[in-house]
């Protein structure tokens, strides 16, 4: 199903999403849904220029750079396992309140208000 939802830019990393998900106990479809939403399905400059497939922006700074796309996926899976799922935030809505809170200082254009809906839509497409 992922091949029908992921753009070619992200399709080549499907196995990395699956490996990271298995390694940390995170649903790979959730990782892919977040990546699709955060990167405009592989079109964002953060993805193209910084190998950041997950929208990681520490402390309100700009997008974090990674050595490889796979390293960024692994990092985000570990963070989700430790700081979200491991703390009982197990739904997309619960994760979104912490991961992309509307009105956050690093969200000047109000895009976080679309995070839960966007990630949920991609997640259910991947699960269909």
Model region roles, listed by residue range:
Residues 1-128:
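Catalytic cores of secreted/periplasmic lytic hydrolases that degrade extracellular macromolecules
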């Amino acid at each position: 199903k992922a091949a029908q939802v992921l753009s070619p830019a992200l399709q080549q990393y499907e196995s990395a999403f699956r490996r990271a998900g298995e390694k940390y106990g995170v649903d790979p479809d959730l990782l892919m849904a977040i990546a699709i939403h955060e990167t405009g399905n592989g079109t964002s400059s953060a993805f193209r220029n910084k190998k950041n497939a997950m929208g990681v922006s520490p402390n309100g700074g700009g997008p974090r750079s990674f050595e490889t796309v796979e390293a960024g996926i692994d990092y985000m899976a570990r963070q989700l396992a430790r700081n979200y799922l491991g703390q009982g935030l197990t739904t997309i809505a619960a994760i979104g309140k912490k991961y992309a809170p509307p009105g956050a200082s690093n969200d000047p254009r109000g895009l976080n208000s679309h995070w839960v809906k966007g990630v949920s839509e991609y997640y259910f497409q991947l699960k269909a």
